[in-house]
Curated annotation (Swiss-Prot):
A single Gene Ontology CC term: cytosol
Family annotation (HAMAP family): 16SrRNA_methyltr_G
Top-rank lineage group of the source organism: Bacteria
Protein name: Ribosomal RNA small subunit methyltransferase G
Taxonomic lineage of the native organism: Bacteria, Pseudomonadati, Thermodesulfobacteriota, Desulfuromonadia, Desulfuromonadales
Catalytic activity: guanosine(527) in 16S rRNA + S-adenosyl-L-methionine = N(7)-methylguanosine(527) in 16S rRNA + S-adenosyl-L-homocysteine
Signal peptide bounds: none
Transmembrane segments: none
Gene: rsmG
UniProt EC number: 2.1.1.170
Species annotation: Pelobacter propionicus (strain DSM 2379 / NBRC 103807 / OttBd1)
Length: 221
């Protein structure tokens, strides 16, 4: 890996975002990216392997979500894969209690390796199907997020039993999020959930458009 190129790209991206990172956070992101590329040679973790694209499309993208979170919240990342956004969120907000879940054991092994390497406290990677958490982690999370995991309806159906009172679901989507939201309206209504806000944004360095879709249970009033 070109350590300098990754670091320079991430610094340029976060400067454009006006998201300040400490030297230690930059180092941790760099180590994460290095391990991601190394493990990806033998485990299918990501299709994004260019140093600059890892900096922007994995790290910077996760930082837009970090702006929606509070360090006192407990967060679940569903279908976490290589630990994205869970690990970048944990690096960006050290006090955030973070749990990731994925059904592929090798991906969870990678996440646990990175957590040990970076000495992440308050981070847990679970090898499980999301449905299996209903019995053990019901109503446990303030925020549940996913990136490229499923459509909005299935995301809500699988995660709603895990959401704490007053919590919210945040789906990381592409530029067609509005269309997907319209398609999911009937399903969301049947599940007694609603979209409460959309947060469209542009990735730095002209790297594409994304959108955060925030959903909550419908008030029982």
């Amino acid at each position: 890996m070109s350590m300098n190129r990754f670091r320079e790209t991430l610094q340029r991206a976060t400067e454009e975002m006006q998201f300040e990172l400490s030297g230690e956070q930059l180092r941790d992101f760099q180590l994460f990216a290095m391990e991601l590329k190394k493990w990806n040679l033998r485990v299918n973790l990501t299709a994004i392997t260019d140093d600059g694209e890892i900096a922007v499309k994995h790290i910077a993208d996760s930082l837009f979500l970090a702006r929606q979170l509070d360090s006192t919240e407990r967060v679940l990342d569903v279908g976490s894969g290589a630990g994205i956004p869970a690990i970048p969120l944990k690096i960006a907000i050290p006090g955030l209690e973070t749990v990731s879940v994925d059904a592929v054991g090798k991906k969870i092994h990678f996440q646990r390796h990175v957590a040990r390497l970076l000495r992440l406290q308050g981070f847990q990677a679970l090898h499980a199907r999301i449905e299996s958490l209903h019995a053990t982690h019901g109503r446990s999370f303030d925020v549940i997020t996913s990136r490229a995991f499923s459509d909005l309806g299935l995301f809500v159906r699988l995660t709603a039993p895990l959401l704490a009172e007053g919590g919210r679901l945040i789906a990381m989507k592409g530029p067609a999020a509005g269309d997907e939201m319209e398609e999911a309206k009937t399903t969301l209504a049947a599940l007694r959930h609603e979209v409460c806000s959309l947060h469209p944004y542009r990735l730095p360095l002209e790297s594409g458009e994304r959108c955060l879709v925030v959903m909550r249970p419908v008030s029982k009033i």
